[in-house]
């Protein structure tokens, strides 16, 4: 997938970001390099390879000692949302900024 300069300008416009021609060209180059890297990674055959939580597991003889995934704080969402101008179903409501 390769982007064109018009794509970068359109994305910048939608995000309400002002970019110069030079910045747009530099961003285009960086994005296309990134997409090229992603395509290379997707081309690798990974069938039969077990996913890792972290690559350090491959070089350390001992697995990482991770803490239990447990709630350690009380749910204070209602307290935090009392001062919000608008909430709904536990979510903060904000004005629409992108059409």
UniProtKB/Swiss-Prot annotation:
Catalytic activity, reaction form: L-glutamyl-tRNA(Gln) + L-glutamine + ATP + H2O = L-glutaminyl-tRNA(Gln) + L-glutamate + ADP + phosphate + H(+); L-aspartyl-tRNA(Asn) + L-glutamine + ATP + H2O = L-asparaginyl-tRNA(Asn) + L-glutamate + ADP + phosphate + 2 H(+)
Gene3D superfamilies membership: Glu-tRNAGln amidotransferase C subunit, N-terminal domain
Enzyme Commission code: 6.3.5.-
InterPro entries the record matches: Asp/Glu-ADT_sf_sub_c, GatC
BP GO annotations: glutaminyl-tRNAGln biosynthesis via transamidation; regulation of translational fidelity; translation
Signal peptide: none
Keywords: ATP-binding, Ligase, Nucleotide-binding, Protein biosynthesis
GO MF annotation, one: glutaminyl-tRNA synthase (glutamine-hydrolyzing) activity
Protein origin, superkingdom: Bacteria
Family as reported in the entry's similarity comment: Belongs to the GatC family.
UniProt subunit comment: Heterotrimer of A, B and C subunits.
Protein function: Allows the formation of correctly charged Asn-tRNA(Asn) or Gln-tRNA(Gln) through the transamidation of misacylated Asp-tRNA(Asn) or Glu-tRNA(Gln) in organisms which lack either or both of asparaginyl-tRNA or glutaminyl-tRNA synthetases. The reaction takes place in the presence of glutamine and ATP through an activated phospho-Asp-tRNA(Asn) or phospho-Glu-tRNA(Gln).
Record's protein name: Aspartyl/glutamyl-tRNA(Asn/Gln) amidotransferase subunit C
Species: Ralstonia pickettii (strain 12J)
Origin organism lineage: Bacteria, Pseudomonadati, Pseudomonadota, Betaproteobacteria, Burkholderiales
Chain's gene name: gatC
């Amino acid at each position: 997938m390769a982007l064109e300069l018009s794509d970068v300008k359109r994305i910048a416009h939608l995000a309400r970001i002002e970019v110069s021609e030079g910045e747009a060209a530099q961003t285009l180059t960086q994005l296309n390099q990134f997409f090229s890297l992603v395509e290379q990674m997707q081309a690798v055959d990974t069938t039969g390879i077990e996913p890792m939580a972290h690559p350090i597991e491959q070089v350390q003889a001992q697995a990482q000692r991770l803490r239990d995934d447990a709630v350690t704080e009380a749910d204070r969402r209602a307290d935090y949302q009392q001062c919000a101008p608008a909430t709904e179903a536990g979510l903060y409501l904000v004005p629409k900024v992108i059409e």
